[in-house]
Amino acid sequence: MKMKRSPYCFCCSFALLLLVSFLKDRHFCSADPTDGFTEVPLTEDNFVIQKPYDKPLNDRYSYKNGIRRLWVYENDKPFKVGSPTRPRTEIRIKGHDYSSGVWQFEGQVHVPEGTSGVTVMQVFGAVNKATALQLRVYNGDLKSYKSNSVATDIYNKWLRVNVIHKVGKGEITVFINGQQKLVVNDDGPAEHYFKCGVYAAPDGSSNYMESRWKNIKLYKSDNKLEGCNNNHGTWLVQ
């Protein structure tokens, strides 16, 4: 006996076709912040170390087995004579400064217990201040500057950090271990670059500060991507 297809089935089929057509026109990511980006090759020449001016490099920095270890003391000198800035041992990514486009920093960071009151990652360049973003550690918690919480209980763990800067939109998004944790404005257009390591905060710094970094990478997107919505796994297109 020949069975008739119900109008309900036709409606379902039509709805499915519409859904497939809609999805084909969207960019997707697998909840990974690097999807849709192209890796920018880096060499050791791109890793410039800023350290207390009176200390030899190996007194504040080591690179062994793929791990970059950076440390500084609260009473160390600044990175150059006459600078009013706080003590630091930082990696400055050189050769890829930018003032437009969509750029991304990626790295894995380990902060030993006891390190506090220190910036471990920065997006340099802003209108009204020196930086568009600072990720600081206070008593085992990772914060944006001193307020917005990014991650808690981070001591003695490796964290994957991804920072996406959409210059045209003036927006910075921070991911920890692949999960979106923070979206902030970048305080206006400027010449930008990425930094990581240890840079003593204006106050509340521990006597000894250390961070370790590995798998540092830089990415750029040629598309006008506005970000990855991790709740749905899709790229939001400008």
Curated annotation (Swiss-Prot):
Residue stretch(es) of the prosequence: 225-238
The record's listing under Gene3D superfamilies reads:
2.60.120.200
Q: Does the keyword NADP apply?
A: no
> Where does the signal peptide begin and end?
1-31
Q: Which domain of life is it from?
A: Eukaryota
Subcellular location per UniProt equals: Vacuole
Ordered alphabetically, the record's keywords are: Signal, Vacuole
> InterPro entries in the record, alphabetically?
Alginate_lyase_2, ConA-like_dom_sf
Sorted alphabetically, the Gene Ontology cellular component annotations on this record are: vacuole
UniProt xrefs under Pfam families: Alginate_lyase2
Asked whether the UniProt record includes Signal among its keywords, one would answer: yes
The record describes the protein's role as:
May be a subunit of a vacuolar malate and citrate transporter.
- Name recorded for this polypeptide: Citrate-binding protein
Query: What organism is recorded for this protein?
Result: Hevea brasiliensis (Para rubber tree)
